[in-house]
């Protein structure tokens, strides 16, 4: 393996291998059409696989992001799983557009927050009637990733998925059934309120200084 400008490749006889699943003695890796080692979720030949977000190693016989993988690394396919995987794939694509490979996690957090804070506001549906159901966080996040706009729930869900791709593990979409925000490490990140009210206040805010109280939150 070689790393160039933050991207990992595999060379054989001095040439990059491309568009294949590479098997080493211990692990499998997916190399894309440019020879880059794939990280995160990926669809390959009609199946979904997960490759460690840092190393690119294929995961097998375990649960990742709440999704079961078989001994070949294939994700269990059902409507909820496929929806969440596609949302995570789109979140990763967006992070790659917004952030540099060399950015620190803190820099990525700020850049992702700033990006979401600029998303045009549009409400496609109400959260209150459906928040007891599974999968609404993917549905709302897709408003931003697929349509480029959304409400506070859409913005918060999209930001939460993006931060998850940046390597943050304790990320939640929290809400009071009408307004939503991101909870990260017990702190509030509210992109819509930041834009509409006070930009710096609603970035890394303590709950003691926040006017909303969560009735529900979903871990990404």
Question: At which residue positions do the language-model features occur?
Answer:
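Secondary-structure boundary elements
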Residues: 86-143
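Short polar catalytic/cofactor-binding loops
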Residues: 7, 120, 194
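Hydrophobic/aromatic-rich core segments of domains that either
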Residues: 154-215
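Extracellular adhesion/carbohydrate-binding repeat motifs centered on closely spaced tryptophans
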Residues: 1-89, 175-176, 181-184, 199, ...
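Substrate-binding/catalytic groove segments of enzymes
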Residues: 57, 122-127, 188-190
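Active-site neighborhood of thiol-dependent amide/isopeptide-bond enzymes
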Residues: 117, 124-180
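Basic, glycine-rich
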Residues: 217-220
